Amino acid sequence: MAEEQPQVELFVKAGSDGAKIGNCPFSQRLFMVLWLKGVTFNVTTVDTKRRTETVHKLCPGGQLPFLLYGTEVHTDTNKIEEFLEAVLCPPRYPKLAALNPESNTAGVDIFAKFSAYIKNSNPALNDNLEKGLLKALKILDNYLTSPLPEEVDETSAEDEGISQRKFLDGNELTLADCNLLPKLHIVQVVCKKNRGFTIPEVFRGVHRYLSNAYAREEFASTCPDDEEIELAYEQVAKALK
């Protein structure tokens, strides 16, 4: 008889109305991991302005997101991800770790470059900061268009050309995607709203990647509303003046 699965509940930051999902890439990352694992779970949004006594009892520190697994409370996004990968494992649940270590660091600089770009109010610095973001996006694009080792046929004399894989580490979503995609979504929404900047079409690998990601329910359905992201960055994003 199959072992009964403990109750799994993910507590995430609520949006502006105190109920819907708010802007938090870490919350979305874990939401995606649980969905991809195929485990039965509940998501509870926590209004950071009005935390309930239950939430205070479960997690006195109040750091979001946090996970309730049976009676165990787990905090720290990286540790929660490691825990889920260890306990929700094959044969019952899929392994989500990337096969290629490089997939875990692809696009690693994008969010920092985006933050510097969006927080700047000095027009004289804008071009250089935008170039920094573009350079980070270019590095990701290069990774997405370069064939992975398993895509290369060593017996063929032909050039393997451009990778057509859907995601960072192949044709299935992995933990690497769960980490990067929520951040890329924020970059797109905030840059368009506050700088009129969109990811250049020349970055075909990035556009293919995002298009494939938005076609997946695990990503598209866990994204907060654009308005929630814009609201979260209202005080963070500076106008050029």
Curated annotation (Swiss-Prot):
Segments of this protein annotated with the region Required for insertion into the membrane: 2-90
Modified residue annotations for N-acetylalanine: A2
Intrachain S-S bonds: C24-C59
Topology in membrane: Single-pass membrane protein
UniProt motif (G-site) ranges: 24-27
Transmembrane annotation, as ranges: 26-46
A single GO molecular function term of this UniProt record: oxidoreductase activity
EC number(s) given by UniProt: 1.8.-.-, 1.8.5.1
GO cellular component: chloride channel complex; cytoplasm; endoplasmic reticulum; nuclear membrane; plasma membrane
Summary of subunit composition and partner proteins: Monomer. Homodimer (in vitro). Interacts with TRAPPC2. Dimerization requires a conformation change that leads to the exposure of a large hydrophobic surface. In vivo, this may lead to membrane insertion.
Stated family: Belongs to the chloride channel CLIC family.
Entry protein name: Chloride intracellular channel protein 1
Gene designation: CLIC1
